[in-house]
C-alpha cells in the first residue's frame, strides 16, 4: 500500500544539497545533458560552480539548454556534439573539450540512453541493436575514451552511470534496455576493480519513476499527468521522484566527500524495486493484442519523430 501523505513524510527538495562552490575548478561532462534528468544533473553541477559540458547528437537542443543553464545558474555550460554510438566522434569530441578547457573532465555522468516499450515477439533485430548501441556500447565508448586519457595523463576521475532497477530484476516489454543497463552495471563494477589503481572510480545511480517527457514518452502511450498519477500508487512512498533528486545524489557521490564509494549501484526509487520489480511496467501490458501494440508504437513514434527501425 502506498503512503497517503507523501508531502508530509517524503518531501521533494530540489535545491542543491552541497555547499555553493563545491565543484569550483572541476570540469564535468554529462552525456544526454540536453533534457530531463541529464539537464537537471548539468544544472546542479553548474549551480555548484563546476564548468559543465553537455553532450548529445542534436546541437540545436543542446545549445538552448546550455543557454538556459547559464542564465539560471550564472555558471558555465558548454554544448558539444557527440554521437556516443560512434567511437570516432566520441574521440573527436574529447579532443575539442581538451583543446577548449586544457584538460579532460574530472567528472563524467553517463546519462545518454534510449528505450521504448515493445512486445519482444514484435521486436526487430535492428530495434534491439539500436538500444544496445546507445546504452551499452555508447556508455563503453565514452567511459573508456575518458579512462584512457586519464591513464595517459595520470589524472583521476569520478564516473557515474545512470541505470535502472530492472537491470537486475528484469522487466517485460523493455528487454533491450534491461539487457543494456545490466551490462552497464556490470561494467561499472568491473572497472571499479580494474581502474581504481589509476585514480578512477565508478558508480551507478538507478532512478525509480521520474517523469520526463523524453523517457516516459517512449515508454507509455498515455498522457504524462495521468501516468504519473497512476505511478504514485505503485510506489511505497506514494509519489514519483524528481530529476533534481537524482541530480543531487549524482553530485554528492561525484564529490570528494564520497571518494571511498566505488563500484556501488545505488537505487533512488522510494522502494519501487521491491514493490513492482523495478520496471514500472503495469501488468495491463500483458493483455495487449497486436492492434494495441501497433497503436502504441505509432503514438510513441509520433512523439519522437523516428521512423521504424
UniProtKB/Swiss-Prot annotation:
A GO CC term attached to the entry: mitochondrion
Binding site for substrate: 57, 116, 124, 218
Keyword line: NADP, Oxidoreductase
Keyword Nucleotidyltransferase: no
Residue runs in coiled coils: none
Family (UniProt): Belongs to the short-chain dehydrogenases/reductases (SDR) family. 2,4-dienoyl-CoA reductase subfamily.
GO biological process, one term: fatty acid beta-oxidation
EC number(s) from the headed UniProt entry: 1.3.1.124
GO molecular function: 2,4-dienoyl-CoA reductase (NADPH) activity
InterPro entries membership: NAD(P)-bd_dom_sf, SDR_fam
Name of the protein: Probable 2,4-dienoyl-CoA reductase decr-1.2 [(3E)-enoyl-CoA-producing]
Amino acid at each position: 500500500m502506498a503512503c497517503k501523505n507523501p508531502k508530509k513524510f517524503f518531501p521533494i527538495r530540489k535545491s542543491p544539497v552541497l555547499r555553493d562552490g563545491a565543484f569550483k575548478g572541476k570540469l564535468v561532462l554529462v552525456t544526454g545533458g540536453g533534457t530531463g534528468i541529464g539537464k537537471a544533473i548539468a544544472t546542479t553541477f553548474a549551480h555548484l560552480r563546476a564548468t559543465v559540458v553537455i553532450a548529445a547528437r542534436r546541437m540545436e537542443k543542446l545549445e538552448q539548454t546550455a543557454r538556459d543553464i547559464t542564465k539560471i545558474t550564472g555558471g558555465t555550460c558548454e554544448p558539444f556534439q557527440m554521437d556516443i554510438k560512434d567511437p570516432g566522434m566520441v574521440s573527436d569530441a574529447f579532443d575539442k573539450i581538451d583543446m577548449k578547457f586544457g584538460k579532460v573532465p574530472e567528472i563524467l555522468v553517463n546519462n545518454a540512453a534510449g528505450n521504448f516499450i515493445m512486445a519482444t515477439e514484435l521486436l526487430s533485430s535492428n530495434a534491439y541493436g539500436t538500444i544496445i548501441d546507445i546504452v551499452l556500447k555508447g556508455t563503453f565508448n565514452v567511459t573508456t575514451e575518458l579512462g584512457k586519457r586519464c591513464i595517459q595523463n595520470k589524472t583521476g576521475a569520478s564516473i557515474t552511470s545512470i541505470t535502472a532497477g530492472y537491470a537486475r530484476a528484469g522487466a517485460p516489454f523493455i528487454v533491450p534496455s534491461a539487457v543494456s543497463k545490466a551490462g552497464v552495471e556490470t561494467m561499472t563494477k568491473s572497472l571499479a576493480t580494474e581502474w581504481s589503481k589509476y585514480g578512477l572510480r565508478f558508480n551507478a545511480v538507478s532512478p525509480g519513476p521520474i517523469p520526463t517527457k523524453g523517457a516516459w514518452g517512449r515508454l507509455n502511450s498515455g498522457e504524462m499527468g495521468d501516468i504519473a498519477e497512476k505511478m504514485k500508487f505503485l510506489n511505497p512512498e506514494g509519489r514519483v521522484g524528481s530529476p533534481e533528486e537524482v541530480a543531487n545524489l549524482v553530485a554528492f557521490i561525484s564529490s570528494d566527500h564520497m571518494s571511498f564509494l566505488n563500484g556501488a549501484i545505488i537505487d533512488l526509487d522510494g522502494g519501487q524495486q521491491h514493490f513492482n520489480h523495478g520496471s514500472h511496467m503495469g501488468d495491463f501490458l500483458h493483455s495487449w493484442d497486436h492492434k494495441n501494440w501497433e497503436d502504441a508504437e505509432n503514438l510513441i513514434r509520433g512523439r519522437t519523430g523516428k521512423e521504424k527501425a
